[in-house]
C-alpha cells in the first residue's frame, strides 16, 4: 500500500483510559475517515461501515498523577513507555526523536481503525499533543533539578493514594490469578508468621509426617502472602503441631527389616518328575508351614512399622505365595503327563495337549470300566448257575 508523505503529522497516544472509542453512526452520510487528497482508502474502511460496534466495557481510572505535576513519577514513565508498541529502540526514538515519530505516525496503518480504533481524529490529536507537550516540559525541568528522586517518590505515593473505590475489581477483567506479579509485592512477615516454620515437628521418616510437613509449608507460604493473619488459626496450628511432636517423641518409630526367604525355581532345569513324585505331598506340606511361619513373623515385625513398610511386606509375601502356587501347578501338570500314556514320553507337551489327552484317557477308562463291570456280572451269573448244577448232581 503506498504511503502519502505529505499527510499531516498526527501524534496519537495509545492510552485508552483517556479516550474511549465508540462506533455509532447517527448520520449515515458522514464519512468515517477524514480523507486527504490523493490518499487511498484504508484496508478496513469499507468493512467497518457495515458494522456497528458496541461500546467497550468500563475501564479503570488512570492511576497516574495529573498532567499538571511538575515531575512525572517512575510509574508514570513506565506506563508511558509501555504505551508504545515496539522494542526499546523504537520507544526511545518515538519519545525523543521527533523526525522518526513523525514518519512513524504518518503511516496509514497507524490511522486505520483495525489497528488504532480511532473514530474522532481531531479530539485525539488535541489530547495527545497536549499530553506530549506537558510530558516533554516536565522532563526538561526534572533534568535541571537535583531533587528528582524525591519528586519521583512523591509521585509514586500519589499514584498509590488513589481511592480503591474508583477502581474495577481485576478479577472481573482477568479471571485467572496473577500470582507471578503479586509475589514480589507480598508484605513483610509478622512475628507470628515467622515462628510458624520453627514449630513444625522433625521428620520421622514416614510418608504421613512428610506429607503433613509439606502441607504445613504450603499453608505457611499462603499465610505469608496474605495481608491479614488469623491469630486463632495460627494458635490452633501451633497446638496441633506441638501435640504431633509430643506424640512422635512418645512413640518413636522402630525400623526393622524382616528377611523373607524367596525360593527361586530354576525353570531351565530338566524336569525330573518321575523321581520327585513320592515327595510332592511332603514338599507341599513343608512349603505351607514355611509360608505360615513367614506370615506370622511378618505380622510380629510389622506392628511398629509404617504403612509403606507394611505394603512392601504384603507385596513381597504375595509374590512368594504366587510363585509357590505356580510351581505346585507346574508339578501337578508334570505328574498328570506321566500318567497319560499318549504324552508320557513327550517332555515338551503343552498344558492344553495334556488336558485334552487326559480327558480322552478318562473317557476311555470309563468305557473300559463299564465293560468290565458287565463282564463281571456275566461271570457271577455263570458261576451261580454252575454251583446249582453241581448241587443237583451231588444229590442225585
Swiss-Prot record:
InterPro entries: bHLH_dom, HLH_DNA-bd_sf, Myc-LZ, Myc_transcription_factors, Tscrpt_reg_Myc, Tscrpt_reg_Myc_N. Residues 372-393 are annotated as: Leucine-zipper. Signal peptide: none annotated. One of its GO terms (molecular function) is protein dimerization activity. It is found in: Nucleus. Residues 313-365 form the bHLH domain. Glycans are attached at residue 56. A motif (9aaTAD) lies at residues 79-87. PROSITE patterns: BHLH. Residues 233-244 have a biased composition (Basic and acidic residues). GO terms for biological process: definitive hemopoiesis; hematopoietic progenitor cell differentiation; negative regulation of transcription by RNA polymerase II; positive regulation of cell population proliferation; positive regulation of transcription by RNA polymerase II; regulation of transcription by RNA polymerase II; tissue regeneration. Keywords: Activator, DNA-binding, Glycoprotein, Nucleus, Proto-oncogene, Transcription, Transcription regulation. Pfam families: HLH, Myc-LZ, Myc_N. Efficient DNA binding requires dimerization with another bHLH protein. Binds DNA as a heterodimer with max. This is Transcriptional regulator Myc-B. It comes from Danio rerio. The gene is mycb.
Amino acid at each position: 500500500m503506498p504511503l502519502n508523505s505529505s499527510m499531516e503529522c498526527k501524534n496519537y497516544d495509545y492510552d485508552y483510559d483517556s479516550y474511549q472509542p465508540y462506533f455509532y453512526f447517527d448520520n449515515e452520510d458522514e464519512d468515517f475517515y477524514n480523507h486527504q487528497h490523493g490518499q487511498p482508502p484504508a484496508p478496513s474502511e469499507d468493512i467497518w461501515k457495515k458494522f456497528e460496534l458496541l461500546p467497550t466495557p468500563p475501564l479503570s481510572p488512570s492511576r497516574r498523577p495529573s498532567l499538571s505535576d511538575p515531575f512525572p513519577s517512575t510509574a508514570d514513565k513506565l506506563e508511558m513507555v509501555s504505551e508504545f508498541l515496539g522494542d526499546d529502540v523504537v520507544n526511545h526514538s518515538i519519545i525523543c526523536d521527533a523526525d522518526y515519530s513523525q514518519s512513524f505516525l504518518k503511516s496509514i496503518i497507524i490511522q486505520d481503525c483495525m489497528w488504532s480504533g480511532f473514530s474522532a481524529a481531531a479530539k485525539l490529536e488535541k489530547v495527545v499533543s497536549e499530553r506530549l507537550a506537558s510530558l516533554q516540559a516536565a522532563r526538561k525541568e526534572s533534568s535541571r533539578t537535583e531533587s528528582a528522586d524525591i519528586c519521583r517518590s512523591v509521585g509514586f505515593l500519589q499514584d498509590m493514594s488513589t481511592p480503591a473505590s474508583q477502581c474495577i475489581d481485576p478479577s472481573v477483567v482477568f479471571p485467572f490469578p496473577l500470582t507471578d506479579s503479586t509475589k514480589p509485592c507480598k508484605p513483610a512477615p509478622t512475628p507470628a508468621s515467622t515462628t510458624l516454620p520453627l514449630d513444625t515437628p522433625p521428620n520421622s521418616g514416614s510418608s504421613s509426617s512428610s506429607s503433613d510437613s509439606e502441607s504445613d509449608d504450603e499453608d505457611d507460604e499462603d499465610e505469608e502472602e496474605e495481608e491479614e493473619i488469623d491469630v486463632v488459626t495460627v494458635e490452633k496450628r501451633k497446638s496441633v503441631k506441638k501435640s504431633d511432636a509430643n506424640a512422635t517423641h512418645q512413640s518413636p518409630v522402630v525400623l526393622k527389616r524382616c528377611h523373607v526367604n524367596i525360593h527361586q525355581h530354576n525353570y531351565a532345569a530338566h524336569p525330573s518328575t518321575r523321581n520327585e513324585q513320592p515327595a510332592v505331598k511332603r514338599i507341599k506340606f513343608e512349603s505351607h508351614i514355611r509360608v505360615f511361619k513367614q506370615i506370622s513373623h511378618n505380622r510380629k515385625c510389622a506392628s511398629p512399622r509404617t504403612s509403606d513398610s507394611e505394603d512392601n511386606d504384603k507385596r513381597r509375601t504375595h509374590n512368594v505365595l504366587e510363585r509357590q502356587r505356580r510351581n505346585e501347578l507346574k508339578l501337578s501338570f508334570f505328574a498328570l503327563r506321566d500318567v497319560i500314556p499318549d504324552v508320557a514320553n513327550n517332555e515338551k507337551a503343552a498344558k492344553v495337549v495334556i488336558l485334552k489327552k487326559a480327558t480322552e484317557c478318562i473317557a476311555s477308562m470309563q468305557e473300559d470300566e463299564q465293560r468290565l463291570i458287565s463282564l463281571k456280572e456275566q461271570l457271577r451269573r455263570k458261576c451261580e448257575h454252575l454251583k446249582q448244577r453241581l448241587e443237583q448232581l451231588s444229590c442225585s
